[in-house]
Amino acid sequence: MNILITGCFGFIGFNFLQTCLEDYQDDFNISGIDSLNNPYSKLNHNLVKERNFEFYKEDIKNIMNVDFKNKNFDMIINFAAESHVDTSIYNPALFIDSNILGVNNLLNFCVKNNIDNFIQISTDEVYGSASKDNEFFVESDILNPSSPYSASKASADMICNAYEKTYGINIKKIRPANNYGPFQQPEKLIPFSISNIIKNNEVEIYGDGSNIRHWLYVKDTVSGILKVIEYGKSGEIYNIGSGIYFNNNELALKLLEKFNLDSSSIKYVKDRPGHDFKYAVNFDKLKALGWNPKYEFDLALEETIKWNVENSKWLEENIEQIRKNRKLRFESK
């Protein structure tokens, strides 16, 4: 099968690419496209640029202009997206451009080139905040996004629906929970907190730290996506989860304990506007395909910390601008 992986040097996309290159060379003829518009994507590119796959440096907005050398793709797997909620708050247009118009361009490319299969990597945030302790969103629930980021991803899901009904493209949508693991962009909560700990800075938490997230190791996400590709039904949506929930205080303490620190190293900062209280998804539909998460949280967190510590010099070279951009994070309560 000829596959095109978009956003192949982003966080989840790169973990997916690595797995395909290591374990699925006999199943997939792999091509990738990425704009390389940030330093960590360039680092990931350098790690695999000698591997056996075709890479195209371009933004998905310009995919119609790329010469793919008559590849005749069977499937596009779309990881390309702007994904940081904080950035979406002060620059929503960036997310409309990438996450909505970019997806439309990819689907139009499918129509023009007779590509029958499309995998859209969405997010659990499209459901909005869970309002009760026992509320878990299922795939058929109404979308209620809160941030410009989640609204852009929900919009992309709707565009996928339209292309499926209008043009007959076989589309599967995947909505993972909050991911963590190696190669994650340093502005995200876990790597950002690890960076602060390494630099003897306080771990900064929005509001009172009571917000709850559903944590999913990226390697479990990759195996879930592969399961949907192989066994999922066209036109369906699949949540990916782990059943592991922590509020931000609990998560911060788990990180600090790994460095023999305690809650005195936590600093509470002004809350994010429109901050969802809880994300929670039911993933029985994916389990029915024969998938289950296999990574235990503490061990996966240790692997994540190890990767961030080993790459701390490079991460620190690129994180200072991120610190400056995250204006809300540094406004004390």
Task: Pin down the residues of each PLM region.
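N-terminal Rossmann-like NAD(P)+-binding domain of SDR-like oxidoreductases, especially those catalyzing
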Residues: 1-179, 311-314, 325-332
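Short, solvent-exposed loop/helix junctions and linker helices
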Residues: 6, 89, 97-100, 149, ...
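Short alpha-helical
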Residues: 11, 83, 132, 184, ...
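C-terminal substrate-binding subdomain of Rossmann-fold SDR/epimerase-dehydratase oxidoreductases
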Residues: 15-19, 58-59, 197-333
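A conserved pocket-lining segment of Rossmann-fold NAD(P)-dependent short-chain dehydrogenase/reductase
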Residues: 88, 140-144, 169-182, 193-216, ...
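Conserved active-site region of classical short-chain dehydrogenase/reductase
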Residues: 100-108, 187, 219-222, 226
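A glycine/serine/threonine-rich, flexible loop-to-helix segment
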Residues: 133, 186-194
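Hydrophobic alpha-helix immediately C-terminal to the catalytic Tyr-X-X-X-Lys motif of short-chain
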Residues: 155, 159, 163, 193, ...
